[in-house]
């Protein structure tokens, strides 16, 4: 039965076509039969890093002609690929992991091939974004994928400020050496917001941490191993809270304190003085910043 389906997939591969092939994001067993069929039959395999792709091909006994198509040479390589397609060749495109053109090279190549009149066919498979969302437990069909978080704190804060009231989950990628700073910036704006950190998805040390932003910070501080590996963050939707319930005096006190203190500290002090909820006061201050 296995061979029957593999042969059927192989028979459907035709020349003069660019196949955009999703590859495993960690566990090699996640490769699809169709992906194997395309890679076996491909005359040319465009790889982000040929060394990484060579390991994948070797694991399945596939020998293919690898060419490097990276961000810096994608535009010029696209013309060569069009030439291969003109000769009737089967061309496959892969990234190091997951689906090409999603935070990886591939978009320019696909566009150029389409413009030249050739077919671009997706070969679906692993996706870190969908894998993280599938276990996050968020309801509804709407979500926003941001890609990698900006490297500079100022840019991150500006981006996060836009998400204070987001009513939908937000998925993003982050690197181990920046995760601490990113969580710190999040904590300044929404320390009580729920977050899931998915680490090393499908790999040996796969981990999913869920809690408030502050709790995730604490977990990473307590165990340095949790800051290693590739990461996907899922920021849960903001809770719909209103500030009309706050007394006028509490709002005035909060306004005075935020002029002199960091927002989090001002909210804590205002809560002690007024007896109002710390989160409601904190969110009130954020609403002022976003006006």
Swiss-Prot record:
Keyword Nucleus: yes or no? no
Q: Which reaction does it catalyse?
A: cytidine(1402) in 16S rRNA + S-adenosyl-L-methionine = 2'-O-methylcytidine(1402) in 16S rRNA + S-adenosyl-L-homocysteine + H(+)
Q: Name one GO molecular function term.
A: rRNA (cytosine-2'-O-)-methyltransferase activity
What the entry lists under PROSITE patterns is as follows: RSMI
Tell me which CDD domains the record gives.
RsmI (cd11648)
Main localisation, per the record?
Answer: cytoplasm
What Gene3D superfamilies does the record tag this protein with?
Answer: Cobalt-precorrin-4 Transmethylase, Domain 1, Methyltransferase, Cobalt-precorrin-4 Transmethylase, Domain 2
Cystine pairs annotated here are none
Keyword Transferase part of the UniProt annotation: yes
So what EC number does this one have?
2.1.1.198
**Protein's cellular compartments:** Cytoplasm
Q: What class of enzyme is it?
A: transferase
| Keywords from the UniProt entry | Cytoplasm, Methyltransferase, rRNA processing, S-adenosyl-L-methionine, Transferase
Q: Which GO terms describe its cellular component?
A: cytoplasm
Q: Which family does it belong to?
A: Belongs to the methyltransferase superfamily. RsmI family.
Cited function? Catalyzes the 2'-O-methylation of the ribose of cytidine 1402 (C1402) in 16S rRNA.
Query: Which PANTHER family does UniProt cross-reference here?
Result: RIBOSOMAL RNA SMALL SUBUNIT METHYLTRANSFERASE I
The identity of this protein, by name, is Ribosomal RNA small subunit methyltransferase I
What is this protein's gene name?
A: rsmI
């Amino acid at each position: 039965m296995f061979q029957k389906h593999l042969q059927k997939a192989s028979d459907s591969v035709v020349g003069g076509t660019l196949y955009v092939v999703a590859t495993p994001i960690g566990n090699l067993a996640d490769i699809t039969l169709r992906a194997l069929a395309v890679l076996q039959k491909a005359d040319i395999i465009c790889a982000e890093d040929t060394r990484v792709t060579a390991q994948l091909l070797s694991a399945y006994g596939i020998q293919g002609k690898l060419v490097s198509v990276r961000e810096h040479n994608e535009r010029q390589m696209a013309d060569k690929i069009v030439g291969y397609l003109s000769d009737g060749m089967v061309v496959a495109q892969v990234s190091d992991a997951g689906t090409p053109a999603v935070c990886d090279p591939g978009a320019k190549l696909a566009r150029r091939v389409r413009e030249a009149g050739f077919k671009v066919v997706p070969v679906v498979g692993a996706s870190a974004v969908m894998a993280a969302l599938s276990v996050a437990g968020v309801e509804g069909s709407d979500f926003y994928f941001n890609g990698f978080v900006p490297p500079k704190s100022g840019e991150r804060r500006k981006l996060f400020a836009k998400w204070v009231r987001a009513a939908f989950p937000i998925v993003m990628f982050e690197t181990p050496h920046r995760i601490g700073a990113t969580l710190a910036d999040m904590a300044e704006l929404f320390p009580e917001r729920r977050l899931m950190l998915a680490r090393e998805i499908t790999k040996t040390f796969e981990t999913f941490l869920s809690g408030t932003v502050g709790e995730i910070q604490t977990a990473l501080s307590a165990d340095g191993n949790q800051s290693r590996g590739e990461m996907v963050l899922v920021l849960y939707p903001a809770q719909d809270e209103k500030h009309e319930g706050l007394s006028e005096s509490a709002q005035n006190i909060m306004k005075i304190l935020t002029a002199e203190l960091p927002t989090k500290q001002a909210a804590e002090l205002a809560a002690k003085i007024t007896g109002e909820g710390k989160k409601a006061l904190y969110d009130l201050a954020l609403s002022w910043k976003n006006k």
